[in-house]
Amino acid sequence: MFRLNITMLRYIAKNHGDGSGYAISRRTGIPESSVYRYLKGEAQPDLNSAMRLAEAYDIDLRKVIKRVPVEAAA
């Protein structure tokens, strides 16, 4: 199973001057409410949103997605 690496996303976004969910939303076009749910760990992005994050910050998708054991994901 794969999950959004929230720590890495925050780090990369901050390095691009995006220190808030609002700023991430503006850069990526992902709805602000979705970004805040991702940052709180309440939701996971679908492939489309994950690709938007990667493209907006010019990074490999694997930088913001991490593999987690299936038991930990439940």
Name what the model sees in each region:
Residues 1-3, 37, 55, 65-74:
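Short, charged recognition helix plus adjacent turn
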Residues 18-20, 45-48:
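Residue-level signal for the short linker/turn that defines the boundary of a DNA-recognition helix
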Residues 17-37:
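Short alpha-helical DNA-recognition segment
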Residues 14, 26, 55:
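Short polybasic/polar patches that bind polyanions
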Residues 48-63:
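DNA major-groove recognition helix of helix-turn-helix/homeodomain DNA-binding modules
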Residues 1-23, 62:
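A short, Lys/Arg-rich alpha-helix, primarily the initiator
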